[in-house]
Amino acid sequence: MQFDKSEVHVKVADATPTPCIDFSKIQSVIDPPDLLKVQLDSFHNFIQDSVPLAKRRDQGLERVLRSAFPITDTRGLYLLEYISYSFDKPKYTVEDCIERGLTYDVSLKVKLKLSYKDEPDEADWKETIQQEVYLGRIPYMTERGTFIVNGAERVVVAQLHRSPGVVFSEAIHPNGKKMYSAKIVPTRGSWIEFQTDINNQIFVYIDQKKNFLVTALLRAIGFAKDEDILGLFDLVEEVKITSAKKEQLIGQYLASDIVDMQTGEVVSARTAITEDIVDQIIAAGYKSVRVMKSFSGNDKGPDKSIIINTILNDNSATEEEALEIVYEELRANEAPDIDAARSFLERTFFNQKKYDLGDVGRYRIRKKLSKEFEELHGYLDGQPELKKLSDTIYEKILHTIQSFSDEPIGGDILVLTHYDIIAVIYYLIKLVNGQAEVDDVDHLANRRVRSVGEQLAAQFVIGLARMGKNVREKLNSRDSDKIAPSDLINARTVSSVVSSFFATSQLSQFMDQTNPLAEMTNKRRVSALGPGGLTRERAGFEVRDVHYTHYGRLCPIETPEGPNIGLISSLSVYAEINDKGFIQTPYRVVTNGVVTDTVLMLSAEDEENKITVPVSIPLDENMKIAIESVQARTKGDYPLVPAEDVNYMDVSPVQIVSAAAALIPFLEHDDGNRALMGANMQRQAVPLLTAEAPIVGTGMESKVARDSRSVILAEGDGIVDDVTAEYIKVRYDIDADTDVRLSLLDPDEGLKTYKLIKFKRSNQDTCISQKPLIHIGQRVSKGDVLADSSSTENGELALGKNVLVAFMPWRGYNFEDAIILSERLVYDDVFTSIHIHEFEANVRDTKRGEEQFTRDIYNVSEDALRNLDENGIVRIGAEVKERDILVGKITPKGESDPTPEEKLLRAIFGDKSSDVKDASMHVPAGMKGIVIKTKLFSRKKKVGLDIKEKIEILEKKYDYKEYDLRKKFLKRLKQLLEGKTSTGIYSDKGKLLVAEDAVYDDSVLERFTAIPFLESIDFVKGVTQSEKVNENVMLLVKEFRLKLKDLNDERDNEKYKLNVGDELPPGIEELAKVYIAQKRKIQVGDKMAGRHGNKGVVGKILPIEDMPFMENGKPVDIVLNPLGVPSRMNIGQLYETSLGWAGKELGVKFKTPIFNGATYQEVQQELEKAGLPSHGKVSLYDGRTGEQFDDEVTIGYIYMLKLSHLVDDKIHARSTGPYSLITQQPLGGKAQFGGQRFGEMEVWALEAYGAANILREMLTVKSDDVIGRNKTYEAIVKGQNLPEPGTPESFNVLVRELQGLGLEIRIDDRVP
């Protein structure tokens, strides 16, 4: 932050920010984009909520609705058309939805037009009804890029899937021959695959069903004759028949039929020419003959004999025969007639409703086969007859498409055409001849991202298709009685599909909210799993591996360690997703060795075959590459190339990795595997009691904190008006002439109030709390940090603490990555964190009567109820422990259903305690803490005077707000119009309000701005002679009307809430929530880690006096095992340790960006500057004996994190508890309060020791001998000897299984 010396800038937390030394040598040319742009842009492009109706583009929801309509009935009497859609404002705030367990959503309303006529033949529609219809509610994205669904904050993860288009691949047959295939993958519709085989033929597979020859498909689409097909591939040769060429003809194949006009004899095409046939042709009077071209090794062009081979093996000779073959192979039965077979083929590939390549699919095919299309069109231009046939087929395809759509065809055709099929065959022929390359399926040009908007669009397509079917059924069953669009539409159809997607889809995830970095990474994640994607079991090594096209697009480091490795990735810092779904990364253009300032966003396809260099290449003062040959990158190679050949340069050293990996200082000195762990473990760091930013950072800390939306930023320049722990008020500067709108955003002329989040529970039970950084009267600039969150310090991400570390073994306690801590870290709450747990109790109306929250619980002591209020809910501030009552609740007993008379008597005389049972909610085992918040929601409608009074108060409140808004508007209008000349203003009744050429003064403005006339004035025509003023007046009026509408909507919403009561999930009458805060200090068993993958478990907490100490008597805070460094190859932690020590001594912080940070020499210089040894080692003394250790020890300050793997959540013990219903064995796991599994190998161990009694106990009374364990319990309680064990229940289960197989098993108790 820049400080102006003329003004006072004081921060609440720290009056003098710590100076920061930046080690970066290369400055990034452009700043990284907003890290949440991926989510926000995708969603808002889908719904286009801020775009005026007339300017909405054909994308997202608009496109889906346009494609779903019009809907007609089978008789052609009704036509339901789509006009536009709109949204209402969300009914509840984000906080309300989280507290009440509701969905943060908006209602979708669609304007539809229903037309009707008496007879299908009538040209004009008789009458039309236009109506706005409610189509359901859509979850709405919050400004943080998340969705609130049933009270839970969720994220929709982007999916990386195979791009639609054409993909060429190869496979090797066991005999060693290469086979090639081409797969055309549409967005919607049947897949078609062309495949060569070992017999040199091309087959076609549709939806991986039975195959048929490609020539049959070409015939079926219109190229009926052999000659037509051969002509497409230039395989027809006209040979003059002379005695010299007679020998050449023998052995060749006829390309067309030869007819002897005198005898009527026919020699059909595909016949091999013999001497007799040559004589026959000459006798028939032919001077020349058309034959199939033959290929020898001397031919210049590609060998196309594969087409000839395919034709020779084709059983069809006409279009009709080919159609029959195609139909039979795909439908497994004969076609009823040729028209049915033809319409089936047309429906499969040429019907836009059934087959859709999509914009991306068409773009990919056009890009991939551009040369083949050129060759094909160039060749057809020289073949008039063939071109005429091809044009006829094309017209036919266009006509087929047109018959399914009322709109004229424009732009790209999104169905297959015959040109596509022929071009694919052209490319296959090139592949067979080794003149083309197969595609790499893992190349990012062949994989695209489906963001949240596209996934929602797909759900709407499904929902609207179901709705369309229902509408058609309703229209077909209707007679000519009047119906409106609202009678046809069932809103539940669409909203149920969308709700199901958010609740159950693999890509809709419960947000990881451990800290701001975890939250942001979750939103930038790209998954190859999910519907239509890969599965863990099927995915091989290649698809998981890092590909050269990932450079600058997907992070090569950040990915999970388990079975999902490589399938889930993170977008790189600079990566963006273009409108076609391909990931782009920025590059600077290099021309003739000179680096320009032009920055282009390139997809993997754009970058292919280009030469790029890293940003670290030396440049001279003219921005020319200073060395003749540079090590560049092209595809997956790193050749030395002349500087003039370079096309692009990176924009930043950070662009290769994701935000989490970019937070690791000295990443370049860490092994990739450990860097992966470091990136992943930062996401697991719990926010601590006091946040502390790292001494050694990378410069990305501020970017992550800001873009995660965890800090509050100033929206403009202004002065802080008020600061408390609950809110911050900033009065922004307003430019009277230009900034018209800002004055209406708040009634207080530019005053904006920011409510601070205080002790909010996250999804992972961590604590989110904001605190102000500014003071009253402070001047702030746009982008300044106004408030920190629980994981930031002065606007920088702060996930851990800087602690003094020594790398040395200590009495074996830090063996195998164990960590030794000083007690100081416990006493001073250095690694103490706050965890907030939410407990929920609800009241339902059961069959036996309604449950009830109460503190009047039968048979419970007054002491146990001491902390409950009159509603039976624990008071705020109460310290609670295991088994304490949080919410008192009684529920009716289930002996019998009460009769109406009994219900009446109980209502009059009160309930007997014997009729209810205690169903109170208690604090679970192993938990203690302080109640920090309680909430009670009731569905019951408020009654009596109470509600009337509240509505009156509400009306007065909103009347005042409206009056205040109008007053502000009029004041602002006067400011704009004062002294300007009028153009003549009339009311809607025609009354002259302001004469033409009149100057606006106080008297004129008083008449003009009279409130009754205000809404009737037409401001569009302009009110002054100045266009600029008119524009500002229009903006002001528009904003005023919007604000007024919002105010009235808000008034109606609040009245609705008062009248109806709290909205709760179905079936729940009352809902109580209790929030308990726990303060957890660091303890033995907690997991800790640095940022370099150096993780470990706290093994020992030593008294401060026992810790190793320096010569000046200062003890270290933490002791790490030095053996954890060399084999893990994460040397970055040693650089960080030494530089952190220097920073602590000098009182400065360091910024060392990855691949662009401090060198070994610079670290040494900083140590020397601080008066510390340049090698970072000093002599330490044993805290127990006071003696000096033999060797010097590396010490310094390292940034350590406390991870959310706390021992309190993991340690667990059970004596008795729940049992499995069938086997009667104890359940497993802490969540089920289960026992420890005594498995097969443990049994072997006891067998090996011969411990027969213990073994018998383990397998019977301690497990599933139901009678035996009850008797054992009684014996222990009574102090008697233990009984003999009985039969384990699992043995009985085995007996029943065998009896189920028909084997009679009897247990013989007799001992022989």
UniProtKB/Swiss-Prot annotation:
Root EC class: transferase
Pfam entry (one): RNA_pol_Rpb2_7
A GO biological-process term: DNA-templated transcription
GO cellular component, one term: DNA-directed RNA polymerase complex
EC assignment: 2.7.7.6
Subunit structure: The RNAP catalytic core consists of 2 alpha, 1 beta, 1 beta' and 1 omega subunit. When a sigma factor is associated with the core the holoenzyme is formed, which can initiate transcription.
Stated role: DNA-dependent RNA polymerase catalyzes the transcription of DNA into RNA using the four ribonucleoside triphosphates as substrates.
NCBIfam families from the UniProt entry: PRK00405.1, rpoB
UniProt-recorded name of the protein: DNA-directed RNA polymerase subunit beta
Gene: rpoB
